[in-house]
Swiss-Prot record:
SUPFAM superfamilies: MetI-like
Membrane spanning residue stretches: 40-62, 103-125, 138-160, 164-183, 214-236, 268-290
Role noted for this protein: Part of the ABC transporter complex OppABCDF involved in the uptake of oligopeptides, including the cell wall murein tripeptide L-alanyl-gamma-D-glutamyl-meso-diaminopimelate. Responsible for the translocation of the substrate across the membrane. Plays an important nutritional role and is involved in the recycling of cell wall peptides.
Disruption-associated phenotype: Double mutant oppB-oppC cannot take up cell wall peptides.
Family statement drawn from the similarity comment of this UniProt entry: Belongs to the binding-protein-dependent transport system permease family. OppBC subfamily.
Assembly notes: The complex is composed of two ATP-binding proteins (OppD and OppF), two transmembrane proteins (OppB and OppC) and a solute-binding protein (OppA).
Signals that turn on the gene: Part of the opp operon, which is constitutively expressed.
Protein name per its UniProtKB record: Oligopeptide transport system permease protein OppC
Family matches, as PROSITE patterns: ABC_TM1
Periplasmic side: 63-102, 161-163, 237-267
UniProt lineage: Bacteria, Pseudomonadati, Pseudomonadota, Gammaproteobacteria, Enterobacterales
Keywords: Cell inner membrane, Cell membrane, Membrane, Peptide transport, Protein transport, Transmembrane, Transmembrane helix, Transport
Topological region Cytoplasmic: 1-39, 126-137, 184-213, 291-302
Topology with respect to the bilayer: Multi-pass membrane protein
Amino acid sequence: MMLSKKNSETLENFSEKLEVEGRSLWQDARRRFMHNRAAVASLIVLFLIALFVTVAPMLSQFTYFDTDWGMMSSAPDMASGHYFGTDSSGRDLLVRVAIGGRISLMVGIAAALVAVIVGTLYGSLSGYLGGKIDSVMMRLLEILNSFPFMFFVILLVTFFGQNILLIFVAIGMVSWLDMARIVRGQTLSLKRKEFIEAAQVGGVSTASIVIRHIVPNVLGVVVVYASLLVPSMILFESFLSFLGLGTQEPLSSWGALLSDGANSMEVSPWLLLFPAGFLVVTLFCFNFIGDGLRDALDPKDR
């Protein structure tokens, strides 16, 4: 009897030591993400890049439009204060890279936001309603997806000229199409779940079911795809600017700076190296963060 009592006390003490606090889905995902060294390091580097493009123009002694006539096409020089060098017009490259980074990051993040808002709502409605409505909505999606996008951009530039608003409109037109397809597929499997059927029996409206029950359950996939969409949109904007269809003077982006640097690569290689370096590092960071989020939120890995 004494032995049994002692054993029970030992088991109770052992169970108290092994007691594990319950974690929610997002707490578990955060723990997984923080254990991914590449993703965490990329997040830190991306924060530093965002800090640079925000603060550097404020701290620099040169403005975006200042021209140093005595330092045209000058190599990076600490003494003169042109830490990244100057372009052919004597403008400070550090400030231009920082301002260009703002525009490139803004385009990528704005495209991801459009994809999240429009694509999630469109895809969840299409998948939940089903039937003929789903068929019509998907056919419309296929028509938009088959539209020659480059021709559309050239048409916009021809009629309305080149400005940053057109870039947002053009990229926003295509950024949500794949997101809508992905969310629709997730919704088709979710709408057969018991909690959706219970909401239907309880008389909950379609809008409430989509917003309160379906959308929160597809957020994991949405977050992962959005994080991988940002670098694609940044690269796409850079490609448009490189071709002369995107951001142009007096504004600039990393793609426009790459285009300028490529023309004088043999004479002034720093004009190409600095914007290219920032662009490549940013793209790698977003991709590593996307991979980390996918590993953290993928239900097959839990």
